[in-house]
Amino acid sequence: MRLSIPPRTSRFAPAVFCVSRASVLWVSLLPGLLAGAGCKKSDSGASSSSSSASGDKAASYRFAFVTNNSSDFWNIAEKGLRKAEKDFGVRVDMFRPLKGEISDQQRFLEDIMVQNFDGVAISPINPDAMTSTFDRVAAKMPLVCHDSDAPKSKRNVYVGTNNIEAGRSAGAAAIAALKAANITKGKIALFVGRMDMQNAIERKQGLDETLGKLPGFEVLPVFLDKTDRALAKKNVEDALARYPDLALIIGIWSYNGPCIAGAVRASSRKDKPVIIAFDEEEETLKSVQDGLISATIVQRPFQFGYQSIKALKDLKDGKQVPTVVDTGILTVKKDNLEQFWNELRELKK
């Protein structure tokens, strides 16, 4: 069973979710937030946080929410977690591997299995390498994958973007921008942290479907940076220097947008390539505003947090839960940037 969040004017307004023709689930997601989160950093290069408010009263369940890196993208997801704590009377601990290492996620999960957690939601760094670990977790407690799936594992639910469709949307935005710039040939470069994560695999699949057969263009091998921002920027600098006919740059993960924008701004090239990004980092949105980035494909990280915790609680309560919760995407360009930006700033308060 798949649950989809349909597009609407505001990404953060109350939503109606359709489960199937036979059954409809109505959910109201108010944009109110629970403030007061504490954060701690371990010596092992990972950080964790939990709501200070959640300790003030007994929580029905304690859940863990594990990210795949420490990008600012996850700050919005944390707002969803704190809202879910308030709405559902649970406690949520958030874990972030600061360097995006699989070893951090493995350690988090081992600790979670021996501590008093009732369920875990995780964005898998390498789903194939972690399948056996995920299956051990799923044997002990409800397991939700968010942002990036582990479809071969025994996870209960995937909450997040349809990443193939997100890739297609990025490709469509790229084609429109190339046409507007009257660019008819050249190289295409893709930048991402790693290609063993399901969201990267699926976004590239969607991009390949739209760009792979574009006449006059050649897609280069993917540039990988292992979530190292300095390397991410250097990769762009190298590509700009190596390929004078570089026509299109696409950043597949959230931090790639700012890294690409910084490198292109500093470049001496007269003909700037078209840039397409993902997600809503502040520098990415500023670059959309000034025209350097043509479009960015944004997700709904608030819903990653909120819907993951809702799914975990429903599973613990013995309720029926859809196996996929599609949180939707939005293509942000200059013409709809201001409205999106205002909503985002309100959400971050």
Describe these PLM feature segments:
Residues 127-165, 187, 279-289, 293-294, ...:
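Flexible loop/hinge segments that line or gate small-molecule binding clefts
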Residues 121-139, 207, 221, 225-286:
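Hydrophobic alpha-helical
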Residues 73-90, 166-173, 198-217, 235, ...:
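Short, solvent-exposed amphipathic alpha-helices that sit
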Residues 105, 159-185, 231-233, 280-284, ...:
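Hydrophobic alpha-helical segments within soluble ligand-binding/sensing domains
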Residues 40, 47-59, 191-195, 199, ...:
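Hinge/cleft segment of the Venus flytrap/periplasmic-binding protein
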Residues 94, 151-176, 190, 222, ...:
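Short beta-strand elements at the ligand-binding edges of bilobed clamshell
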Residues 35-38:
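C-terminal motif of bacterial Sec signal peptides marking the signal peptidase cleavage site
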Residues 58-80, 84-85, 93-111, 117, ...:
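Extracytoplasmic "Venus flytrap"
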